Amino acid sequence: MDTQKVEQYAGVVRKVSKGLKIWNIIGIVGNVLGLLGMAILLIPQVQEQLATVKNPYLTKENIGFGIAVLVVFLLICIFSTILYHKIGESAKAQVLPDKNLLHYAIGVFAFSIVMQVVNQLMSGLGFDITAYIFPAIVAGLLAWVYVTYQKWEQEVAKK
């Protein structure tokens, strides 16, 4: 087993996991702010003013649906942050992280992409490919972590 390679692989996994964790913390803040904004729309005085606008997207039902979607995205961000933290902590100690953590992180990310597509299609605004620039970057980073993990696992198996 080449300890330099193990250190290098652990460093890559740790740094990318830290970056993804920070990205998810930003997502948590954004979702909380979005929830606050949506909650403001449910205040009776605001509802009275929205009734004069006659916008079909500003009904209580649509606002409630938006809140539900934001809550799901918030929970996804919280869960992903915990996963990336655990992966990063294992890598920091140069201990091979549990492979299931990577599988969970990839699964949660795939689920969030499906949720985003469904949300876009149900919103009536249509499909916008530009909304997937950052998810594509995150997918690339997750793939990089997974490939690095595989190399790290092979190096540890050489003992």
Where is each model-derived feature located?
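Generic alpha-helical transmembrane segments
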Residues: 65-83, 135-139
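Alpha-helical membrane-associated segments of multi-pass integral membrane proteins
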Residues: 27, 107-151
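Membrane-interface interhelical loops and short amphipathic "cap" helices
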Residues: 50-58, 121-127
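Cytosolic juxtamembrane helix at the C-terminal end of the final transmembrane segment
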Residues: 81-100, 139-159
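Transmembrane alpha-helix entry/boundary detector in multi-pass membrane proteins
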Residues: 54-73, 111, 115, 130
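Membrane-helix exit/juxtamembrane interface segments
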Residues: 37-51, 85-91, 150
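Membrane-interfacial loop-to-transmembrane alpha-helix junctions, especially the N-terminal start
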Residues: 24, 97-104
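Cytosolic juxtamembrane helix and N-cap/initiation of the first transmembrane helix
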Residues: 1-44, 56-64
